[in-house]
């Protein structure tokens, strides 16, 4: 719920992205998982975006937004449910290696890896399209507005 979002993060957050994180973390805990691996940083480091104009935003994502906004938010959510988050693509050795490669070498490596290991993956995974998270804007969500306007924020 939206109240869970505020309790976990102890501040107003982008409820559109936190709601699915809470649902995922809760389900993982219910299934008995104690740790999960993410692909965070892989697209940014290895040119996983299809459009060339997204390349400029990749630097900002890896060095500005991921470590200071996205990952802490996700980590707080996961740890609330006692599930450890591991991001192997953001290990210092992987980041250094990726940045040492010329961009042309990194571009498209994701598809090369998929092609190489396709025999290990189910068809529904191989053929699944990547979709951005789509949620209602906070301005349109009455529950989000109720939380945002709550008296509790005036005392912080």
Locations of regions flagged by a protein language model:
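ATP-dependent adenylate-handling ligase core
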Residues: 1-31, 51-56, 100-105
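Short, solvent-exposed loop/turn and secondary-structure capping segments
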Residues: 47-49
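Short beta->alpha linker loops
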Residues: 19, 40-41
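Adenosyl-5′-phosphate
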Residues: 32-38, 44, 56-156
């Amino acid at each position: 719920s939206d109240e869970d979002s505020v309790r976990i993060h102890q501040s107003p957050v982008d409820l559109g992205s936190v709601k699915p994180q809470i649902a995922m973390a809760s389900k993982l805990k219910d299934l008995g998982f104690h740790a999960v691996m993410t692909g965070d940083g892989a697209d940014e480091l290895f040119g996983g975006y299809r459009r060339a104009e997204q390349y400029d935003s990749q630097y900002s994502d890896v060095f500005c937004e991921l470590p200071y906004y996205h990952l802490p938010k996700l980590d707080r959510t996961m740890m609330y449910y006692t599930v450890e988050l591991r991001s192997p693509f953001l290990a210092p050795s992987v980041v250094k290696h990726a940045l040492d490669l010329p961009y042309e070498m990194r571009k498209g490596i994701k598809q090369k890896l998929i092609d190489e290991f396709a025999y290990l993956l189910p068809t529904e995974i191989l053929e699944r399209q990547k979709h951005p998270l789509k949620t209602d804007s906070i301005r349109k969500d009455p529950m989000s507005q109720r939380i945002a306007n709550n008296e509790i924020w005036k005392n912080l």
